[in-house]
Amino acid sequence: MRPARALIDLQALRHNYQLARETSGVRALAVIKADAYGHGAVRCAQALEGEADGFAVACIEEALELRAAGIRAPVLLLEGFFEASELALIVEHDFWCVVHSLWQLEAIEQAAVAKPLTVWLKLDSGMHRVGLHPKDYQVAYQRLQASGKVEKIVLMSHFARADELDCPRSSEQVAVFEAARQGLGAEISLRNSPAVMGWPSVPSDWVRPGIMLYGSTPFEENNSVAARLQPVMTLESKVICVRELPAGEPVGYGARFITDRPMRIGVVAMGYADGYPRHAPTGTPVLVAGQRSRLLGRVSMDMLCVDLTDVPQAGLGSTVELWGKNILASDVAQAADTIPYQLFCNLRRVPLVYCEG
């Protein structure tokens, strides 16, 4: 069997969830959209059920997968519904629903629902992606209350730049949100992972931890909370071939790396078809046989090369960690000019192996 695999540490996942709740001091929805950022939504939900106050996914298809697996905890649809016909399923399965557009509000008003909904009413406080305009927010709230179709409303918005701690934009968004909700007595939810970790003064009754659940920081540098995160995914494979090359020899497609001395090169069963970034440059960190080393040359579809020259204990069959508990996904992402979110979500073809610790 091909040795590439991703180990998913469910104990670390629970630790990170508890850290988010402890840090914020309020209830927390575990964000497991996009198949739990590549970690497997069903298994992650099963590991957290009984501890999590609820879950958040992007769409009804992701939510239905959880219900089919027996997950009974509240599930919030972060993008709400795309067609009015989905409302029947939302009611049937007791999903919570974001309302971010006037057409969704009108659909609820016109729907014949068997029981009232829980709605998270989203304000566009400055990200300008989805959300109601501040001038429409109070009216939308009043219309939902008057509709007879809604039993609870939570007020929410989303930060655009909370991962930039010196940027005033988040404070400006809070001010817009506070002005828009003035006089409304509902619960609120503003804080995502960077806001949980870096903006403790932002008010919230609910937080929505995403990337921090999986043990990765949204910040370029660690802070006190980031230092306590535990990586959940360890992407690893093995050395399947060893080459002894003299100085001046090219390695891989395009001869992007030329040996500058006699070198030992390890070929690893991992490539961009598995989700490892093709544009990761020479020097991207890896761990080989327990020792830190580096990527060499261009990443191929199914293979990549690593430097074994100064790792004498490494050889055929040695384990290579591409990211995980020793090689942080954020370090790989920085080297490859991407973000940990994309590394995790791009993972494919690699089997997920679940473990506890």
Swiss-Prot record:
| Record-annotated active site | 33 (proton acceptor), 253 (proton acceptor)
User: Is Isomerase among the key words of this record?
Assistant: yes
Q: Name the source's superkingdom.
A: Bacteria
What GO cellular component term, any one, is given? cytosol
Q: Which Gene3D superfamilies match?
A: Alanine racemase, Lyase, Ornithine Decarboxylase, Chain A, domain 1
Q: Kindly list the GO molecular function terms attached to this UniProt entry.
A: alanine racemase activity; pyridoxal phosphate binding
Record: residues binding substrate: 129, 301
Please name the NCBIfam families in this protein's record. Answer: alr
Record-stated family: Belongs to the alanine racemase family.
Role this protein plays: Catalyzes the interconversion of L-alanine and D-alanine. May also act on other amino acids.
Supply the name of the protein: Alanine racemase
Question: Which organism is the protein's source?
Answer: Pseudomonas fluorescens (strain ATCC BAA-477 / NRRL B-23932 / Pf-5)
Q: State which gene encodes it.
A: alr
